[in-house]
Amino acid sequence: MAELLLGVNIDHIATLRNARGTDYPDPVQAAFIAEQAGADGITVHLREDRRHITDRDVRILRQTLHTRMNLEMAVTEEMLAIAVETRPHFCCLVPEKRQEVTTEGGLDVAGQRDKMRDACARLAAAGIQVSLFIDADERQINAAAEVGAPFIEIHTGCYANAETDAEQAKELARIASAATLAARLGLKVNAGHGLTYHNVKAIAALPEMHELNIGHAIIGRAVMTGLKEAVAEMKRLMLEARG
């Protein structure tokens, strides 16, 4: 069974800061608190429209984090250049649409193998480990292995948004099957999107899971209980699921 890690996404600390155009709350300070509370890594999504995390945030976080930076980004020339210059520990390549509220669905790796292969090779040459954010789909998992990504991150949105227990169980089975296939192909398996304190345990219990990236639920809880307590509680639930 893989060791289970928690990556805390701090995008919405920046969302709150940018809502008033101030310099607070500071994502760098939030990252430090999250690390102290047990986060194994810090995830940030540098979007093309810079709606929350900024280039400056990325630079400072890379210099100050005590754990690992996971930079989520679209597969564009601009973002690849920023990643190669900044050299985060991990890059998670995601699809991106300007009009979306949050990332909707996974990358179509199978439909753009050459582009993904080139991006993975370029990032790997800079010493960056690459993850591809994909749906729990056999075709996409096979394609991820073919293009040379060492990690995938399974999109858990359909599981998280399921309206009935039966629908959620079906999505969980799909994720479990996808994780098993990925591990068999030599891929390390992460997961994220829509995971909360109420639904995380079933995903955390899957033996192939290496890291869960969780943001909105933790920041939402932090408003009520404080960030340190919110991160620690999520980590406790994840480890509890592993027995």
Curated annotation (Swiss-Prot):
<feature type="binding site">
    <location>
        <begin position="215"/>
        <end position="216"/>
    </location>
    <ligand>
        <name>3-amino-2-oxopropyl phosphate</name>
    </ligand>
</feature>
<dbReference type="GO" id="GO:0005829">
    <property type="term" value="C:cytosol"/>
</dbReference>
<comment type="similarity">
    <text>Belongs to the PNP synthase family.</text>
</comment>
<protein>
    <recommendedName>
        <fullName>Pyridoxine 5'-phosphate synthase</fullName>
        <ecNumber>2.6.99.2</ecNumber>
    </recommendedName>
</protein>
<feature type="site" description="Transition state stabilizer">
    <location>
        <position position="153"/>
    </location>
</feature>
<feature type="binding site">
    <location>
        <position position="9"/>
    </location>
    <ligand>
        <name>3-amino-2-oxopropyl phosphate</name>
    </ligand>
</feature>
<keyword id="KW-0664">Pyridoxine biosynthesis</keyword>
<feature type="binding site">
    <location>
        <position position="102"/>
    </location>
    <ligand>
        <name>1-deoxy-D-xylulose 5-phosphate</name>
    </ligand>
</feature>
<keyword id="KW-0808">Transferase</keyword>
<dbReference type="Pfam" id="PF03740">
    <property type="entry name" value="PdxJ"/>
</dbReference>
<dbReference type="InterPro" id="IPR036130">
    <property type="entry name" value="Pyridoxine-5'_phos_synth"/>
</dbReference>
<feature type="binding site">
    <location>
        <position position="47"/>
    </location>
    <ligand>
        <name>1-deoxy-D-xylulose 5-phosphate</name>
    </ligand>
</feature>
<comment type="subunit">
    <text>Homooctamer; tetramer of dimers.</text>
</comment>
<feature type="binding site">
    <location>
        <position position="20"/>
    </location>
    <ligand>
        <name>3-amino-2-oxopropyl phosphate</name>
    </ligand>
</feature>
<dbReference type="InterPro" id="IPR013785">
    <property type="entry name" value="Aldolase_TIM"/>
</dbReference>
<feature type="binding site">
    <location>
        <position position="194"/>
    </location>
    <ligand>
        <name>3-amino-2-oxopropyl phosphate</name>
    </ligand>
</feature>
<comment type="function">
    <text>Catalyzes the complicated ring closure reaction between the two acyclic compounds 1-deoxy-D-xylulose-5-phosphate (DXP) and 3-amino-2-oxopropyl phosphate (1-amino-acetone-3-phosphate or AAP) to form pyridoxine 5'-phosphate (PNP) and inorganic phosphate.</text>
</comment>
<feature type="active site" description="Proton acceptor">
    <location>
        <position position="72"/>
    </location>
</feature>
<feature type="binding site">
    <location>
        <position position="52"/>
    </location>
    <ligand>
        <name>1-deoxy-D-xylulose 5-phosphate</name>
    </ligand>
</feature>
<keyword id="KW-0963">Cytoplasm</keyword>
<dbReference type="InterPro" id="IPR004569">
    <property type="entry name" value="PyrdxlP_synth_PdxJ"/>
</dbReference>
<feature type="active site" description="Proton donor">
    <location>
        <position position="193"/>
    </location>
</feature>
<feature type="active site" description="Proton acceptor">
    <location>
        <position position="45"/>
    </location>
</feature>
<dbReference type="GO" id="GO:0008615">
    <property type="term" value="P:pyridoxine biosynthetic process"/>
</dbReference>
<feature type="binding site">
    <location>
        <begin position="11"/>
        <end position="12"/>
    </location>
    <ligand>
        <name>1-deoxy-D-xylulose 5-phosphate</name>
    </ligand>
</feature>
<comment type="pathway">
    <text>Cofactor biosynthesis; pyridoxine 5'-phosphate biosynthesis; pyridoxine 5'-phosphate from D-erythrose 4-phosphate: step 5/5.</text>
</comment>
<dbReference type="GO" id="GO:0033856">
    <property type="term" value="F:pyridoxine 5'-phosphate synthase activity"/>
</dbReference>
